[in-house]
Amino acid sequence: LPARDLWLQLIHTRAETGEPYIVNLDRCNEALPQEQKDLGLEVTQSNLCSEITLPTDSERTAVCCLSSVNLEYFDEWKNSEQFIDDMITMLDNVLENFIEHSVDTKGLGRYNATYDRFKNYVKKDHKGFTKAAYSAYRERAIGLGAMGFCSYLQRNAINFESMYATSFNHRAFSHIKERAVAASNSLAEERGEAPDMAGSGLRN
């Protein structure tokens, strides 16, 4: 089967069903934080829905802690000083809970262990989670997404293809990203940077 024909079949099926999910790994690796590139890490796959593109290798199984905000109520929470901060802190707390239940963090000590050292401190009943726990420990990957975009547009009588919809999209996601990065900076000062992100000022 010629590659062009296969590609056309994939695109046609995607247009009809929404699947299969298609991921450009070269683009994912271009967007990987420089700190992780410097460690020789690489994205080789995504999860099924393709919203998680994290490095995996013989020592790591990708772990990402996800939540979402409801954009339908954006006007109600956009001016809150704490809303996004609280979401980021909650996600970091969930990761910390996973790490602490998987690893003897007191015995492990300093917060920058190699895999060979780390695996010796994984709790006996969590040995099957060693690579996942190490990934969580090193990267502290979180994702704060959004739902309710169309609901916001409907509630405010905004046409989906209008410039107003495009403007809202940019405004909402810029707000979320700006507040999320600021929250991660604050957490890095309070709790320390993720080992993979040393020097970035980021916790997640």
What are these model-derived regions, one by one?
Residues 14-136, 148-153:
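Function-dense linear segments that define catalytic or interfacial modules
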Residues 1-42, 111, 115, 146-194:
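Conserved, charged catalytic cores of large soluble enzymes
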Residues 139-146:
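Aromatic-lined, polymer-binding surfaces characteristic
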Residues 198-203:
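Acidic, glycine-enriched catalytic cores built around paired aspartates
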